[in-house]
């Protein structure tokens, strides 16, 4: 399957978010039905999560340079990285000349990223602590809202992404990267994953009407561009 392009008419879509890059925990698979994605992730210490997020093993399947190429020219574009975590994509976007808002609900992640920015002398990343239920975007603030491995952490997604849409410029887009809803070697338990069809249905409720879906670029994840 190359890319599929789907266009829909849509109307309207409160939230919990955090950030994941976990290998499935088979010993605790029985908890999948009751444990939330956020509870599952917070079994791990922040330092362990950062090490995992920034690992060569992640690079191998996340293919960040291919993802950035897929996003196109980001020079001088304002991009919010929702669930920025350790800054995995935020730093790479900044390296390509984007003006990045690295947004996260976690003080630990924000503090770690602040130190990284200072050490590396990065000038084009703004840290933004956000609440669980709001991306804290100003109207028409960004060209791109990027959310990687975090969509499945958000609970009231229709409401949350209607706010994201309001914060995106007229010709801007939302880009979602998350795990296929199947058994793969990385990511959260299958019960925490969200299917492509469900994502599109929820985004339609949030007011999005144009979708580009790529299932070939990454081995374990889909990419959805929405406007």
What do the predicted segments below correspond to?
Residues 143-157:
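A short SAM/SAH-binding and catalytic strip from SAM-dependent methyltransferases
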Residues 135-144:
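A short acidic, Gly/Pro-enriched loop at the edge of an enzyme's catalytic core
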């Amino acid at each position: 399957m190359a890319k599929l392009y789907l266009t829909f008419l849509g109307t309207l879509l409160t939230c919990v978010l955090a950030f994941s890059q976990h290998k499935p925990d088979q010993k605790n698979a029985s908890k999948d039905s009751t444990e939330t994605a956020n509870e599952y992730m917070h079994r791990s210490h922040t330092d362990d999560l950062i090490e995992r997020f920034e690992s060569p093993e992640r690079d191998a399947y996340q293919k960040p340079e291919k993802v950035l190429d897929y996003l196109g020219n980001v020079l001088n574009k304002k991009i919010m990285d929702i669930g920025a975590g350790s800054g995995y994509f935020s730093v790479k976007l900044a390296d390509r000349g984007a003006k990045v808002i690295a947004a996260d609900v976690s003080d630990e992640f924000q503090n770690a990223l602040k130190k990284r920015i200072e050490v590396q002398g990065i000038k084009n990343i703004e840290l933004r602590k956000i609440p669980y239920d709001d991306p804290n975007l100003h109207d028409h603030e960004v060209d791109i809202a990027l959310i990687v491995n975090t969509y499945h952490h958000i609970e009231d997604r229709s409401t949350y992404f209607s706010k994201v849409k309001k914060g995106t410029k007229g010709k801007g887009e939302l880009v979602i990267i998350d795990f296929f809803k199947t058994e793969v070697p990385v990511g959260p338990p299958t019960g925490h994953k969200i299917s492509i069809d469900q994502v599109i249905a929820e985004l339609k409720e949030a007011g999005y009407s144009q979708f580009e879906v790529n299932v070939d670029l990454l081995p374990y994840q889909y990419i959805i561009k929405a406007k």
